Amino acid sequence: KTWTHFVAWAKANPGKLSYGSTGTMTSPHLTMELIAQKLGLELLHVPYKGSADLMQSILGGQIMAAADSTGFAPQVEAGKLRVLNTWGAERLAKFPDAPTLKELGLDLVQNSPFGIGAPKGTPEAVVKRLHDAFKQAMEQDSYKTALARYDMVPMYMSTSAYKKFAQDTFTREKALVEKLGLAKPT
């Protein structure tokens, strides 16, 4: 019923609480594993090929919980699912009663911003032109409206901030993938 119930049940039943994600090594999967590590939980991960398969399984009762970033709002609004927490820095306007991980005592914010890259060696003038065009597009009301449909919050980052974010995310997730034994031998 609540995140507190989820954690208590998982602790009392190690390895029995099944949760689905949109696939192995996706952000939802890795974030759930990080949460489990921080809380000392042993969860049963069930990977799916995307949100549609995941949604069918949670609604059909094949899994007990689901970690996904979008697509669940209609089911929550219909009373078929509930949001136990959100992973952003702030609560979602659509689900104001769902606490963030930080509010639940986990020092963790997981966002999956979209970015655009260019080949190494691309002239700075071209990088700046692309950056400025995408920044301008992100400021458009139509962009913000499109994100809101999926309960996503605009998250602008400068070129250098996004580069640092991507590097930090790669480092953190690489360590987690190795710890989980998911890294393929090279």
Please report, for each region that a protein language model flagged, where it lies by residue.
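Alpha-to-beta junction loops
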Residues: 13-17, 39-41, 59-66, 80-83, ...
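An extracytoplasmic/periplasmic, membrane-proximal ligand-sensing/linker region
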Residues: 38-41, 77, 124-186
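Short beta-strand and adjacent tight-turn residues that come in two discontinuous sequence segments
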Residues: 48, 67-68, 86, 157
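Short helices/loops that flank or line small-molecule/ion binding pockets
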Residues: 34-38, 52-63, 73-80, 166
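Structural motif corresponding to alpha-helix initiation and N-cap regions
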Residues: 3, 51-52, 69-70, 95, ...
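Short secondary-structure boundary segments
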Residues: 69-71, 88, 120
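Hinge/capping helix and adjacent helix->loop/strand transition within the periplasmic-binding protein
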Residues: 1-53, 101, 106, 111-146
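Ligand-binding "clamshell"
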Residues: 41-42, 76-86, 93-104, 174
